[in-house]
């Protein structure tokens, strides 16, 4: 039951962070491209890589993995919003932005997971 509460706590923090970061990115860059979703996916991917690496090295407890890896990062990152925003760009005829959105999210998020892992593994 403790892990369920930790996931809920982490999820509430991640959801609020996602909301605040998305609003911030709209204020900075406007709403013509989904920069907020890209930012939270990149940040979450990097942190997920780091949490995974720490878990592999047994430096974090299962409770912390539940709090951060499942709760916080699960709520912070968002594949459904990414998919919806990409579809909206396609429906508006903005093919170049839709393709850019897919390429940036997929390639950069994969790289950020790798970078997060390497940051931790290189310090061991």
From Swiss-Prot:
GO molecular function, one term: fluoride channel activity
Pfam families: CRCB
Reactions it catalyzes: fluoride(in) = fluoride(out)
UniProt subcellular location: Cell inner membrane
Keywords: Cell inner membrane, Cell membrane, Ion channel, Ion transport, Membrane, Metal-binding, Sodium, Transmembrane, Transmembrane helix, Transport
Highest taxon of the lineage: Bacteria
Transmembrane segments annotated in the record for this chain: 20-40, 60-80, 102-122
Regulation: Na(+) is not transported, but it plays an essential structural role and its presence is essential for fluoride channel function.
Location (main, coarse): membrane
Tagged with keyword Transferase: no
Family named by the database record: Belongs to the fluoride channel Fluc/FEX (TC 1.A.43) family.
Biological role stated in the UniProt entry: Fluoride-specific ion channel. Important for reducing fluoride concentration in the cell, thus reducing its toxicity.
HAMAP family, sorted: FluC (MF_00454)
Protein name per UniProt: Fluoride-specific ion channel FluC
Source organism (scientific name): Shewanella frigidimarina (strain NCIMB 400)
Classification lineage: Bacteria, Pseudomonadati, Pseudomonadota, Gammaproteobacteria, Alteromonadales
């Amino acid at each position: 039951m403790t892990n369920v509460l930790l996931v809920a706590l982490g999820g509430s923090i991640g959801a609020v962070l996602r909301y605040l970061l998305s609003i911030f990115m709209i204020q900075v860059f406007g709403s013509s491209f989904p920069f907020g979703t890209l930012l939270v996916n990149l940040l979450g991917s990097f942190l997920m890589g780091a949490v995974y690496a720490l878990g592999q090295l047994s430096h974090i407890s299962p409770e912390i993995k539940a709090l951060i890896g499942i709760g916080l990062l699960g709520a912070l990152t968002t594949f459904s919003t990414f998919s919806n925003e990409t579809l909206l760009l396609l429906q508006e005829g903005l093919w170049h932005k839709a393709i850019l959105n897919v390429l940036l999210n997929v390639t950069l998020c994969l790289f950020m997971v790798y970078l997060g892992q390497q940051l931790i593994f290189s310090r061991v």
